[in-house]
From Swiss-Prot:
Residues 10-90 form the BTB domain. It comes from Vaccinia virus (strain Ankara) (VACV). Belongs to the orthopoxvirus OPG047 family. Coiled coil: none annotated. Might have a role in the suppression of host immune response. The gene is OPG047. It comes from the Viruses. SMART domains: Kelch. The keyword Ribonucleoprotein does not apply. InterPro entries: BACK (IPR011705), BTB/POZ_dom (IPR000210), Kelch-typ_b-propeller (IPR015915), Kelch_1 (IPR006652), SKP1/BTB/POZ_sf (IPR011333). Residues 125-218 form the BACK domain. Kelch repeats lie at residues 269-315, 316-359, 361-404, 406-443, 444-476. This is Immune evasion protein OPG047. Keywords: Kelch repeat, Repeat.
Length: 476
């Protein structure tokens, strides 16, 4: 056990030992101890007050007092008063700190604080944070607050039953709060709203609404029972800052950074996932709200990805295949702590076409230029299954659900009907394409972009559901 010595105090101990000794029995929590009250009263004002001699007719030299201190901490303080030495380790330091604060023994107070700060541990958090607030120990409070903020995902369940409004506010408003995104704070509150009481005000005081997803904003409106959310222009928290993004940065610059990324969208939010950055495949992702013109943080994926595909389903965002792990799949959505690995694909696939019908995810193509296999994953299932094969291979095609049918279009075109579990051929596009996109505009299915024989296709085609064919779109 480490020993700490107060050399200045040690010089005075010899003189104190020559003084008249008065014995006092101290009843503490967990036991009692007989002390030389003369020495102990010299230690601090607390002991001078609580060990005051109560003379009787018999002038009894032994008195008895009761102190609200645990016997182990009191024993350490008594030993220090006799020797100038205090014994501190990780097991006794927190209780000893509280006892030394109550007894006003400054050397032990600052020695305990320095010991705690040098090797701060999770088990110190609650007591140290409460002592920091209660006794105004700013360095202990600041260090503990930052520790809790940085380890928030590990400590969130431990602190909720111990901290009051002020304690939670200091933590949740911190730049150091380690959360994957701002939606996580809202989700954390909703899960505990029955316990939090007046912490409803925290939502207004600590949430950085400019980094919330639309779902997070709607949750705030629901919590506050309002139709318009408060304005916020705070900087992002350190945990979800992107080291390669300067602040502020416009949306076009952010999009340029995510070169060769996978993209998909949910409503007005476009998700940019993986790609090529600094001459390597990376695992970063970001969301861009093109209506409010702000970016929304996404935690890094478990795997770097290039030539992957993304699809929203089951209130989650799924990322499928791509290099360097072409069978891997993972999912995430705003408010989740991290991406979750999902069952692997049955075949390795890069740039596969993906779509979702009734929360069933379908994956087509991306394996080889001759492959016609398809796979699907049912909600809450732990294994992909092969579906009906397509008529044509769709190595670089795209997919979209339109009118309850799953359209698969590239150099060739066909659609899948879930009710009959069959594919149906339709006319090929007028201009065959690799890596095009299907979009819906004014209830019309449009085919845009793509390449063919190294040339970009700038003609837009519209699907005619009466003739099962494609026409050049005139914008009407």
């Amino acid at each position: 056990m480490p020993i700490f010595v107060n050399t200045v105090y040690c010089k005075n101990i010899l003189a104190l030992s020559m003084t008249k000794k008065f014995k006092t029995i101290i009843d503490a929590i967990g036991g009692n101890i007989i002390v030389n009250s003369t020495i102990l009263k010299k230690l601090s004002p607390y002991f001078r007050t609580h060990l005051r001699q109560k003379y009787t007719k018999n002038k009894d030299p032994v008195t008895r007092v009761c102190l609200d201190l645990d016997i182990h901490s009191l024993t350490s303080i008594v030993i220090y008063s006799y020797t100038g030495k205090v014994y501190i380790d990780s097991h006794n330091v927190v209780n000893l700190l509280r006892a030394s604060i109550l007894t006003s023994v400054e050397f032990i107070i600052y020695t305990c604080i320095n010991f705690i700060l040098r090797d701060f541990r999770k088990e110190y958090c609650v007591e140290c944070y409460m002592m920091g607030i209660e006794y105004g120990l700013s360095n202990l409070l600041c260090h503990t607050k930052n520790f809790i903020a940085k380890h928030f995902l590990e400590l969130e369940d431990d602190i909720i039953d111990n901290f009051d409004y002020l304690s939670m506010k200091l933590i949740l408003e911190s730049d150091e709060l380690n959360v994957p995104d701002e939606d996580f704070v809202i989700k954390w509150y909703i899960k505990r709203r029955n316990k939090l009481g007046n912490l409803l005000l925290l939502i207004k005081n600590v949430i950085r609404s400019n980094y919330l997803s639309p779902r997070g904003i709607n949750n705030v409106k629901w919590i506050l029972d309002c139709t318009k959310i408060f304005h916020c222009d705070k900087q992002p928290r350190k945990s979800y800052k992107y080291p390669f993004i300067e602040y502020p940065m416009n949306m076009d610059q952010i999009i340029d950074i995510f070169h060769m990324c996978t993209s998909t969208h949910v409503g007005e939010v476009v998700y940019l996932i993986g790609g090529w950055m600094n001459n390597e495949i990376h695992n970063n992702a970001i969301a861009v709200n093109y209506i409010s013109n702000n970016w929304i943080p996404i935690p890094p994926m478990n795997s770097p990805r290039l030539y992957a595909s993304g699809i929203p389903a089951n209130n989650k965002l799924y990322v499928v295949g791509g290099l360097p792990n072409p069978t891997s799949v993972e999912r995430w959505f705003h408010g989740d702590a991290a991406w979750v690995n999902m069952p692997s694909l049955l075949k390795p696939r890069c740039n596969p076409a993906v779509a979702s019908i009734n929360n069933v995810i379908y994956v087509m193509g991306g394996h080889s230029e001759t492959d016609t296999t398809t796979e699907y994953l049912l909600p809450n299932h732990d294994q992909w299954q092969f579906g009906p094969s397509t008529y044509y291979p769709h190595y670089k095609s795209c997919a979209l659900v339109f009118g309850r049918r799953l359209f698969l279009v590239g150099r060739n075109a066909e659609f899948y009907c879930e009710s009959s579990n069959t594919w149906t051929l339709i006319d090929d596009p007028i201009y065959p394409r690799d890596n095009p996109e299907l979009i819906i505009v004014d209830n019309k299915l449009l085919l845009i972009g793509g390449f063919y024989r190294e040339s970009y296709i700038d003609t837009i085609e519209v699907y005619n559901h009466h003739t099962y064919s494609w026409n050049i779109w005139d914008g009407k």
